[in-house]
Design a protein with these regions (language model features):
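Transmembrane alpha-helix segments characteristic
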Residues: 15-22, 365-385
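Transmembrane-helix signature of polytopic, membrane-embedded enzymes
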Residues: 156, 173-196, 369-373
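Transmembrane-helix motifs of polytopic, lipid-linked glycan transferases
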Residues: 48-55, 146, 160-182, 357-358
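Short hydrophobic/aromatic helix or loop-helix immediately within or flanking a transmembrane segment
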Residues: 103-153
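Alpha-helical transmembrane segments and terminal signal-anchor/GPI-anchor hydrophobic tails
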Residues: 233-368
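Loop-to-helix entry region of an early transmembrane alpha helix in multi-pass inner-membrane enzymes
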Residues: 131-145, 150-171, 342-349
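Short acidic/glycine- and proline-prone juxtamembrane loop motifs at membrane-interface regions
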Residues: 205-212
Length: 425
């Protein structure tokens, strides 16, 4: 069934989703008049979008029921988390962020507020540059904030968008998993479960770009995987490179390498492989210049320095484990409510530590041969996270989600005992 979806048909499905992303907030805007009603309007908007995505790509009634459950469950998780840890009186207020938040949370919300004000005076297509936005990656926030020009710019209204984004990512990854002949049914079930309830995206009650950015990258990966002609491949690469750059500057390099890898891996001719290597080096230098010009010297030094490589084995272990010990969560929350979002980092660390143990324990049977574009991209993002000076678990988990089909095919249902071992620690 999934083999019937071609590059062109998937592109048509994307246009339908994009059209609804534009139209639904406008249609629901009359109902978004207060904190409660605007939150409900946002939930309805992105619930419809989620169901449409599942219907268009996965099609089966089982998947529709499953993702309905996943959407509602994640909305409840985010709502309970915010009301319990942050602001129990949120819905009787104006929907503004808590004044106790860290500076970066407040400046992001303030930047979006200024963007919405500029749109009201200059039109919906007003574009703020980085200097005016005064926050990193302003490009992606123009898309993230669009629905809330109509549904009101309130903190919790972004929660349903985060849920939709994470579930659309899950749909795309599971779709590619089902198209692969090397993934068995047991592995597919694990991929479906873990991607739809991915620990790093469970606490959706905040304004951040990661769920939406990773969703866009997953769309790019599907386009690359479905492309056959040279035009389709070039178009897919451009799309993936742009959205990867929007999410995190260094990801444009990884998008280029992962796109190039598929052609290189399939080619048997040595001369052609050498030609691909030559083209790859040229492309790498060109993309590297783009990232260097977009970042400060200090930021670039965080990725390219000797210590990053020398300390890589240790950084891999600590990056996979995340914040530790996990029992420090309750003490941290007392210091600042923003630490309450680290709960998903602890959950992600537990999952990733089990992932690491499983690979070490099964290293003799684990195969890194014939990796597909999605897996290469995932490992590339993980590596960039390990090498970065500002390493934190989110940088690693953004890549790890793309490696799950490969990982569960390697360890299969045996992962459960490694997860339990990690959880016990």
């Amino acid at each position: 069934m999934y083999q019937n979806i071609t590059f062109n048909s998937y592109l048509c499905k994307l246009f339908i989703v994009a059209a609804l992303f534009v139209v639904l907030p406008i249609a629901l805007s009359p109902f978004a008049t207060a904190t409660v009603s605007s939150y409900l309007a946002s939930c309805i908007c992105f619930f419809i979008l989620t169901i449409v995505c599942v219907k268009l790509i996965l099609k089966g009634s089982f998947y529709i029921r499953y993702y309905v459950f996943a959407f509602i469950a994640q909305i409840i998780i985010g709502l309970m988390h915010y009301l319990y840890f942050v602001d129990p009186h949120y819905f009787v207020g104006t929907g503004q962020p808590s004044s106790a938040f860290w500076h970066e949370y407040l400046t992001t919300f303030d930047a979006i507020e200024r963007l919405q004000e500029a749109r009201r005076s200059s039109g919906i297509f007003y574009w703020m540059d980085a200097y005016e936005f005064q926050n990193s990656h302003p490009e992606i926030y123009h898309f993230i904030s669009y629905p809330f020009f109509f549904l009101q710019n309130k903190w919790m209204n972004y929660s349903p968008l985060n849920v939709f984004s994470s579930l659309f990512t899950s749909v795309n990854i599971y779709f590619l998993c089902c198209r692969s002949s090397s993934v068995n049914e047991e592995s597919k079930k694990l991929v479906l479960g873990w991607t739809s309830f991915f620990p790093s995206f469970l606490l959706n009650d905040m304004i951040w770009r990661d769920p939406f950015g990773i969703c866009l990258i997953s769309i790019g990966v599907v386009l690359i995987s479905l492309s056959n002609s040279a035009i389709e491949k070039f178009f897919s690469f451009i799309v993936t490179a742009i959205v990867s750059f929007y999410q995190r500057t260094m990801y444009i390099l990884i998008a280029g390498i992962s796109s190039f890898w598929g052609y290189f891996n399939r080619t048997k001719n040595i001369g052609l492989k050498l030609f691909y290597v030559f083209l790859g080096i040229i492309a790498f230098v060109y993309l590297k210049n783009i990232t260097d010009s977009a970042n400060t010297e200090d930021y670039n030094a965080g990725y390219v320095n000797a210590m990053s490589y020398l300390a890589l084995p240790i950084k891999i272990i600590f990056g996979m484990i995340g914040p530790f010990p996990w029992v420090q969560f309750f003490k941290s929350v007392e210091v600042n409510v923003a630490y309450s979002w680290q709960l998903q980092d602890y959950l992600m660390g537990t999952f990733q530590f089990g992932y690491l143990i499983a690979l070490f324990h099964n290293w003799k049977s684990v195969s890194f041969k014939n990796l597909d574009t999605m897996t290469i991209l995932g490992f590339g993002i993980m590596l960039s996270g390990f090498l970065s000076k500002q390493m934190h678990i989110g940088y690693i988990s953004e890549g790890l989600i793309f490696t799950l089909p490969w990982f569960f095919y390697q360890v299969r249902v045996g992962y459960a005992r490694y997860f339990k071992l990690s959880l016990s620690i």
